[in-house]
Amino acid sequence: MAASTSHLRSLCSSTRSLSRSGVIVTPIACRGYATTDPSPSATTPTPVRRRTTFKDKLNAGPSFSDFVSNGNDNAPLDPSEAYALKTALVGPAGRKKEMTRLPSWLKTPIPDSKNYQRLKKDLRGLNLHTVCEEARCPNISDCWGGSDKSSATATIMLMGDTCTRGCRFCSVKTSRAPPPLDPHEPENTAEAISRWGLGYVVLTSVDRDDLVDGGARHFAETVIKIKQKAPSILVECLTGDYAGDLDMVKLVARSGLDVYAHNVETVEALTPQVRDRRANFQQSLRVLDAAKKAQPTLITKTSLMLGLGETDEQLWDALRQLRAVNVDVVTFGQYMRPTKRHMAVHEYVTPDRFELWRQRALEMGFLYCASGPLVRSSYKAGEAFIENVLKKRRAASGGAETIGERPVAVDEASR
């Protein structure tokens, strides 16, 4: 420390002696960077890397798609190979479990189209819900992603997004005390549908056992509002069972809708394991029967899931009972487990078997049957056929409404 101090003093004394001798000492005021850009003349060209034998082999070798297809892109598959289910080990090391992969015929694209974004924006803006989103429907990219307004379809879910029942196959939220009904929902729903310019719309709802009428009047009011804004639109209503209150079923059936749908979901023997304890197969049959008797011109419709462990004889029995109450349309679709909390899939039914049951249903006298792994009760493939049938019926009757077809007010329909 003493040495550095003496050195500093000697520097200062030398500076003072220079100033006394007439020499002006100017401090250096320039700065420079640690590194500077080299001049163009100093820039050396980057040497070109020599092509290697390894790189040549890669360029001449198989592409990524060849690896994915395993080299069998054009090789025909027999049914046993095409429908073979693959497995994979899933989980942390030491605790891996063998899981069955989703079959290729059940895979769908991720929704991302202009129509999809438009429908979603309209629904959120009007505070409306859809069963497409709540039930995690695999067809949402297809139904919402049409190339124009007329081909896009959304199934609007009325009375909120919370159900009072807890079926073991359904992913809709449940609660014993869901939020109260939105009094503006009928008007908002009619506004959304008129904005989309659709020719066919599907309405459904959660079960509301907390309400005296199960929400039937709210449902009927929505149909009436839609018909007031767009008289030519065809309306399908997928309703609950209203706890077996057939007067409420008749109220909705007489509200002016065109298709009355109520799903039995599965065969009678499996109903206690699949559906909520407050629902049963015979009660669902009575709902469909009451709707047809209240409005004979209605098309009645129901849906069953396959892959829950049902037998052929149980399916035959279910179809016979449905035809006995004059159900017009039936659909078959693959049950797909929404979460680990729900029922496990017993079987992935092949497309060939779905086609077999479609033919059997038509032979039994059903007006129409949509059957396939991805078919759902409100899938748009069925709507196109039903729309044509309804238009032909209207044309045959001269387009005039009969007294039985006239939509009535909610209070009048409940009498």
UniProtKB/Swiss-Prot annotation:
Q: Specify whether Iron-sulfur is a keyword of the entry.
A: yes
- GO MF entries: 4 iron, 4 sulfur cluster binding; lipoate synthase activity; metal ion binding
What metabolic or biological pathway is this protein involved in?
Answer: Protein modification; protein lipoylation via endogenous pathway; protein N(6)-(lipoyl)lysine from octanoyl-[acyl-carrier-protein]: step 2/2
Q: Which reaction does it catalyse?
A: [[Fe-S] cluster scaffold protein carrying a second [4Fe-4S](2+) cluster] + N(6)-octanoyl-L-lysyl-[protein] + 2 oxidized [2Fe-2S]-[ferredoxin] + 2 S-adenosyl-L-methionine + 4 H(+) = [[Fe-S] cluster scaffold protein] + N(6)-[(R)-dihydrolipoyl]-L-lysyl-[protein] + 4 Fe(3+) + 2 hydrogen sulfide + 2 5'-deoxyadenosine + 2 L-methionine + 2 reduced [2Fe-2S]-[ferredoxin]
List where in the cell it is found: Mitochondrion
Concerning InterPro entries, the annotation shows: Aldolase_TIM, Elp3/MiaA/NifB-like_rSAM, LIAS_N, Lipoyl_synth, rSAM
Residues involved in [4Fe-4S] cluster 2 binding? C163, C167, C170
Q: Chief subcellular site?
A: mitochondrion
Q: Kindly list the positions annotated as binding [4Fe-4S] cluster 1.
A: C132, C137, C143, S378
Q: Which cofactor does it need?
A: [4Fe-4S] cluster
Residue ranges constituting the Radical SAM core domain according to the UniProt record = 148-367
- The reply on keyword Transferase is yes
Transit peptide start and end: 1-33
Question: What Pfam families does this protein map onto?
Answer: LIAS_N, Radical_SAM
Spell out the SUPFAM superfamilies in the cross-references.
Radical SAM enzymes
Q: Which UniProt keywords apply?
A: 4Fe-4S, Iron, Iron-sulfur, Metal-binding, Mitochondrion, S-adenosyl-L-methionine, Transferase, Transit peptide
Cite the EC number. Answer: 2.8.1.8
Q: Where are the transmembrane segments?
A: none
Q: What class of enzyme is it?
A: transferase
Q: Which family does the record assign?
A: Belongs to the radical SAM superfamily. Lipoyl synthase family.
**HAMAP family linked to this entry:** Lipoyl_synth (MF_00206)
Q: Know the name of this protein?
A: Lipoyl synthase, mitochondrial
Which source organism? Aspergillus clavatus (strain ATCC 1007 / CBS 513.65 / DSM 816 / NCTC 3887 / NRRL 1 / QM 1276 / 107)
Q: What is the lineage of its organism?
A: Eukaryota, Fungi, Dikarya, Ascomycota, Pezizomycotina
